[in-house]
């Protein structure tokens, strides 16, 4: 009996790892070429927060293995600080998918949005709800993420 419980526990442990795999393998880069007023540490924190938001969230009900995750990159260029914690930026998103039965990837989506305004307070969690609009930052990231997943 104890052996069966141990085997059942191990089986559940190993299958749970597969179910936790998320859909994206996102790389986030934030540039601030013309910005001189804001503290540069804020943007490093923002970069890490966005990467965590994109890579750890379960966007669909589908189960993806690690090698099946969609490679994508978000290049965010902060162009100006409009007010405290309010920024104007541009974003370039590119998503790649593996070509079936080959060893290379192909670009599926490549888009640039030149006018994006959002608010970000350092160390404040990025909150998102599918049924409610909570912020310009997470709303825009989720919008482009769903496009990348849907293609």
Model features per residue range: what roles?
Residues 1-24:
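Bacterial Sec-dependent N-terminal signal peptides
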Residues 22-88, 99-101:
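Start-of-domain marker
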């Amino acid at each position: 009996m104890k052996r069966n419980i141990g085997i059942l526990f191990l089986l559940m442990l190993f299958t749970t790892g597969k179910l936790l795999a998320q859909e994206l393998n996102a790389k986030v880069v934030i540039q601030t070429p013309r910005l001189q007023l804001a503290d540069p540490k804020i943007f490093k924190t923002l970069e890490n927060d966005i990467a965590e938001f994109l890579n750890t969230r379960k966007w669909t009900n589908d189960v993806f293995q690690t090698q099946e995750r969609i490679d994508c990159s978000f290049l965010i260029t902060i162009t100006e600080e409009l007010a405290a914690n309010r920024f104007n930026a541009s974003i370039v998103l590119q998503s790649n998918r593996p070509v079936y039965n080959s060893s290379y990837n192909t670009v599926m989506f490549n888009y640039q949005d030149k006018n994006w305004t959002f608010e970000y307070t350092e160390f404040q969690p990025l909150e998102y709800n599918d049924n409610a609009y909570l912020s310009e930052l997470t709303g825009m990231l989720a919008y482009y993420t769903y496009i990348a997943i849907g293609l």
